[in-house]
Amino acid sequence: MFARTKTKYWSGQICPKTATYGQHRDTDNTYAGSQYDRRVDKGERFPPSLNNHHFEEK
């Protein structure tokens, strides 16, 4: 069984799907915590993230 790699999104990119996205550190993929989760609508841009973090769908 193989683990599926989640797609990473960065601030300013267009969101492909309305969903809740969590922030993860770029260097080791550590989850920043639920207080930094953001709901982003399809077609909108991802909001600013923590320094050196990206978004992944939850």
Walk through the language-model features, giving the residues of each.
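A charge-rich, low-complexity, intrinsically flexible signal that marks solvent-exposed coils, linkers
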Residues: M1-K58
